[in-house]
């Protein structure tokens, strides 16, 4: 099976123009050409599971286009998504922001999906996708170090409850890379698919390993890549794996 993880930055693009006329102004405007390029890249990868971080589910920014559903329809996948903020968050009432989400696109038969929430941080969503042989969690952790540590503790509690082999994927915002999440991985019985610590951010000249695909025992990683794709500020991760037969 193949898992593709990509923080697409709401298909707002990159480059100097993103910060004009003011720093960060690009977050207010999506680009259909960028969305098309992202979709074409994802289609070409022929992934069984796609985890999307920072996807717009139909705000005025995208002309009411739900990016998760659009990409899913183009590649023939099932989609599930949810706003990444807590259900009681004031962000649920803010235009554009309330449509900022994370999403799974999946080709295999989905046994179940669950939305969990961290107790701390602005970005709180955890999506759990249960397939026949594996559970996959998708996260976007806090920018604040202390909040990330609390979130990792909660994520550990979810992972160890799983009855199947586990994959945890997402933008961890771990500015120290694997060193920052080492104890979480050891406690949860996870290891990084990115054995060489390849950086994924920023996309133009990657220097930091912010994005991770972590796997548990029972999963064999057969290939891992960070493609040179620059449609977002992050580069995507592509992981080929198979679930070992139970002994």
Regions found by a protein language model. Name each.
Residues 146-157:
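Alpha-helical scaffold elements lining the catalytic groove of polysaccharide deacetylases
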Residues 11-12, 57-60, 87-90, 144-147, ...:
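Active-site environment of divalent metal-dependent phosphoester hydrolases
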Residues 110, 115-117, 130, 157-167, ...:
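Metal-dependent phosphoester-hydrolase catalytic domains
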Residues 1-74, 81-89, 244-247:
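N-terminal, active-site-proximal structural segment of metallo-dependent hydrolase catalytic domains
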Residues 54-133, 225-228:
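Structured beta-strand-rich core segments of catalytic domains in phosphoester-bond hydrolases
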Residues 13-19, 64-65, 91-94, 126, ...:
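Short aromatic-enriched loop/helix-cap "lid" or pocket-rim segments at secondary-structure transitions
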Residues 1-4, 12, 106-111, 122-138, ...:
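Beta-strand-turn-beta hairpins that frame and shape the catalytic cleft
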